[in-house]
Amino acid sequence: MIRANGMDMERISQTLVAPARLDAEREAQLVEWYENLIEMMRMEGVSERGHLQINKNIITLLTDLHLQLLKSTKFPFYSAAYYKALPFIVELRTQGDNRNLSELENCFEVLYGVLLLKLQKRDISEGTLQAVKAISQLLGLLSDYYKKDRAGELEL
């Protein structure tokens, strides 16, 4: 979203901060957060493409948890969500530069791409919407398990 707005804080304030309709204190915090992210992107040399190291670290943690959940027999709903999303993930991995990304990175990339299409008010195919639904369900479950894991409430 930062790159889509040209790393320009004025545009970010108009397109991302203002629509959130926050009180003055929270709005100032959000502006500062975006400013810090922009600075980090410049410092890490990812202004044009690539991900911040902090994002790479989170993807690594999520991937580790994802694999542990799939190996365990305690999480059948997660496994079911994964196998429901898997055909879409496989299709994504065959397109473009996606082969070198992890499955989860592919999932996040498609959600980001669809978000950009929506912001541009472009049409989204029915097949893409089906993929997004399955992938969103998978990532939603993974997010819930990640929060539980971080809180020490998840037994794998």
Per-range role (PLM):
Residues 46-90:
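Active-site-proximal alpha-helical scaffolds that flank and shape metal-associated catalytic sites
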Residues 93-156:
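Glycine-rich, aromatic-bearing surface loops/beta-hairpins
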Residues 1-48:
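N-terminal interaction modules that seed assembly of large macromolecular complexes
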Residues 21-32, 68-74, 83-95, 113, ...:
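Extended terminal accessory/targeting regions
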Residues 3-5, 22-29, 49-54, 72-80, ...:
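Short acidic, glycine/proline-enriched loop segments that cap or flank alpha-helices
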Residues 33-36, 40, 46-56, 104-108, ...:
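Helix-rich interaction surfaces within compact, conserved domain-sized segments
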Residues 29-36, 57, 61-64, 84, ...:
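Charged, amphipathic alpha-helical oligomerization/scaffolding segments
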